[in-house]
């Protein structure tokens, strides 16, 4: 029984799904997808639970969420192993994900009060008040790269605001989704407040097509996000929050410490085997001898990166990709770039057939035209050289995406220029592109999305503002507008 609907664990009525470790092939989880009828059942359960959940005090909802945080802490080792085994990422990185889940809860509580709490302004004849109200029933679609942390970036603020939820994890990480849901169950959520439906495309389409949804919160690829946007077009009554991918530029303008700049670049491009939406996909490197030296050092250090199993000792920097298919897609993308005229500096290699262990790749594309503006979700870095900083900014902005952007330079003036001209939601200076503060908004513009999940601004799309003018009594104004006559004399 792998679906949680209305407080009960039930068996899916859809197709059988089997999840294997992407490196060893070990069977980790199996269960049946939710069919359309079960998706509808989950929605009805969420709708029935909504009035009572929304009417609880914020403190009562907070108690449950903080209880969940405590369960994350006490089950950290077990959840770390589940996430690592299912995604293929190393144990150390999965542990940081669980820690982020825990830390984000206190931040979400504070964000609710600061961004969507209550305000009151006294007026001579009463008061003006601002309150926030939950939308109702929300669908949450989770990604596979951070199957615990990123869905919770939607779920926690949505629950705090008083919404009820239908959660569909990625079909590639059903085990992590179930493990997190069992902790929510232990936290004492009332039946129907949070429901779990497992499945792939058919389940997702059934969920997004529900008429009784009040909104949909999504983290994932731009292609799927665009499909959801089209599906919900013409329905302004539904909130749609999209956090999608990026074709992110990292500008290396000048680096006094080449090794430090190489370290920053590797952290930006290859951490999580390149499976972060903020990863650097495009390296924009200043022409000249220093750029040549940097590039040679980057290739030399990157070729030492050997992906390993989740529990290898010593621990590897990167593990496998989410699947063998995902790894092969990166190799195919590299081969296509070579065919277009790219010059391979470091070829990505599948270490073992039937696994997702893929070494990083670096390819120079300077002078090549017609390069697709797409996100290759893996450890593949494309390099372009530029002559001046204005050209670098133009190249950085030459994308339909707008998630993250970074600059390596000792010059504050150049960073100030980038802040003014960059089209990206995250702009870092001498910091990895993959670094983001949990107390800051997370997200981008253009094809990268429309709202800011998993952090400070998530509260904004989980509740709607209600403005009120209030007075505890009603009296006739001392001064009336022209044309109004409330005298006792009857005019005939």
UniProtKB/Swiss-Prot annotation:
Pathway given in the UniProt record: Amino-acid degradation; L-arginine degradation via AST pathway; L-glutamate and succinate from L-arginine: step 4/5
Keywords: Arginine metabolism, NAD, Oxidoreductase
Any GO MF annotation of the entry: succinylglutamate-semialdehyde dehydrogenase activity
UniProt-listed Gene3D superfamilies: Aldehyde Dehydrogenase, Chain A, domain 1, Aldehyde Dehydrogenase, Chain A, domain 2
Reactions it catalyzes: N-succinyl-L-glutamate 5-semialdehyde + NAD(+) + H2O = N-succinyl-L-glutamate + NADH + 2 H(+)
Domain of life: Bacteria
Main enzyme class: oxidoreductase
InterPro entries assigned: Ald_DH/histidinol_DH, Ald_DH_C, Ald_DH_CS_CYS, Ald_DH_CS_GLU, Ald_DH_N, Aldehyde_DH_dom, SuccinylGlu_semiald_DH_AstD
Pfam families named among the record's database cross-references: Aldedh (PF00171)
Binding site for NAD(+): 220-225
Enzyme Commission designation: 1.2.1.71
Active site, per annotation: 243, 277
Listed GO biological process terms: arginine catabolic process to glutamate; arginine catabolic process to succinate
Alphabetized PANTHER family for the sequence: ALDEHYDE DEHYDROGENASE-RELATED (PTHR11699)
Family under the similarity heading: Belongs to the aldehyde dehydrogenase family. AstD subfamily.
HAMAP family linked to this entry: Aldedh_AstD
Biological role: Catalyzes the NAD-dependent reduction of succinylglutamate semialdehyde into succinylglutamate.
Protein name stated in the entry: N-succinylglutamate 5-semialdehyde dehydrogenase
Native source species: Escherichia coli O7:K1 (strain IAI39 / ExPEC)
